[in-house]
Amino acid sequence: MVLSTVGSAENRDIIIKNLLDDQLAACIQTLSIDSHYVWQGEVCSDPEWLLIIKTRRDLYALVEEKIKNLHEYEIAQIVQVPIVDGFNPYLTWLNQSTLRGQ
């Protein structure tokens, strides 16, 4: 699973479409969030979109590269969170729905 944040609905939609079209993700969930962070020595607060990207661990490098190339931020949050365990039929579907998983 990969987590990323974007600052606009337009950038969100571009990233989602590209990841799904390229079969780099089986599912992407989005949440409207408020982010609080330090940037260039200043405390900032902005509305963002959180992307929860369901993918396989072995596709992370491709997912990261795709997001990096499409992202509107200079330094994008792109982090992988391991899926330790899960409902087997769901994990099978995730595998079958992504690149080279079929």
Model-derived regions, located:
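Positively charged, small/polar-rich N-terminal and surface patches that mediate targeting and assembly
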Residues: M1-Q102
